[in-house]
A protein has these predicted regions:
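Conserved beta-ketoacyl condensing-enzyme motif
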Residues: 1-63, 67-68, 109-111, 189
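Active-site-proximal alpha-helical scaffold in enzymes
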Residues: 2-7, 11, 65, 76-106, ...
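Structural signature of cysteine-dependent C-C bond-forming condensing enzymes
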Residues: 11-19, 23, 38-49, 71-73, ...
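Acidic, glycine-rich active-site loops and adjacent beta-strand->loop/helix elements
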Residues: 24-27, 80-83, 108-112, 171-175
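Short, surface-exposed, charged loop/turn segments at secondary-structure junctions
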Residues: 34-39, 115-127
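Flexible, glycine/proline-enriched loop segments at strand-loop-helix junctions
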Residues: 47-52, 74-82, 141-142
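Glycine-rich anion/phosphate-binding loop at the beta-strand->alpha-helix junction
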Residues: 101, 107-112, 117-120
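Condensing-enzyme catalytic core mediating Claisen C-C bond formation in acyl metabolism
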Residues: 120-189
Length: 189
C-alpha cells in the first residue's frame, strides 16, 4: 500500500495529497490475528500497544498520512466488496464540494493462510492448479481467483498534465437476480 501510494502521487506530480481515503474488505488480517493470538496467549496482560495499533483497519491510511505529513482528511472504508467503491465515492464528493484539490484514493487487501484455507473450503476460490493463465478467467468453474494487492490513484477535480483517465461516474449496484445483474453490466459496457 505504501509503495503503491508513492507511485500514484509521483506519477501525478502531487507532493502531498489533501486527503487520503482507503478501502479494504478485511483490513490487516495478519496483524489482527497476531494481536488476538497474543491477547489470548498472555491472558490480556503485558501486551505492547503497537500490536493493537497495527491491527486496526486504518493502519495503511495512517502510515501513508505519516509518510506525507498529511494532516488533512483521512478515512478508511471497510465495506467488504464495496470498500473501494465507497472510498472512490467519498473522494469524488470531497472534490465536488471543493474540500480538496487532490485526493489519494486506494484499495488494499491481503490473504492470510488461515483466511485462504477457510474461504477455499467454503468453495469461494477456483482450483487454479490445473488451469492455464490464458483460460483462467474464461473458465466457467465456480468461485473466484484468490488474490491480494493494493492500487492507489491520485484523483483531482481538474485535468492535469499526464492524466491517465477521467472518472465518468460511480455506481454501486446490488442485485439478487443474476440475469438482472448481467443485463445492467451490459448496459454499462
Amino acid at each position: 500500500g505504501i509503495v503503491s501510494s508513492l507511485l500514484a502521487t509521483r506519477e501525478a506530480h502531487v507532493e502531498k495529497p489533501d486527503a487520503i481515503i482507503v478501502g479494504t474488505a478485511f483490513g490487516c488480517l495478519e496483524d489482527t490475528y497476531s494481536f488476538l493470538s497474543k491477547l489470548f496467549q498472555y491472558k490480556e496482560d503485558m501486551l505492547s500497544p503497537t500490536a493493537f495499533i497495527h491491527s486496526t483497519h486504518n493502519t495503511i491510511a495512517s502510515q501513508i498520512a505519516l509518510l506525507f505529513q498529511c494532516h488533512g482528511y483521512n478515512s478508511t472504508y471497510v465495506h467488504r466488496a464495496l470498500s473501494f467503491e465507497s472510498a472512490l465515492t467519498d473522494a469524488l464528493l470531497l472534490l465536488e464540494e471543493q474540500s480538496a484539490e487532490n485526493v489519494l484514493v486506494g484499495g488494499i487487501d491481503e490473504i492470510t493462510d488461515a483466511g485462504f484455507t477457510i474461504m477455499d473450503r467454503m468453495g469461494f476460490y477456483k482450483d487454479t492448479s490445473s488451469l492455464q493463465n490464458d483460460i483462467l478467467y474464461s473458465e466457467k468453474s465456480k468461485g473466484a481467483v484468490a488474490g491480494e494487492g493494493a492500487a492507489f490513484f491520485s484523483v483531482s477535480s481538474s485535468k492535469i498534465p499526464g492524466s491517465m483517465a477521467e472518472i465518468a461516474g460511480v455506481e454501486i449496484m446490488s442485485f439478487t437476480d443474476k440475469a438482472e445483474a448481467v443485463e445492467r453490466v451490459r448496459q454499462l459496457l
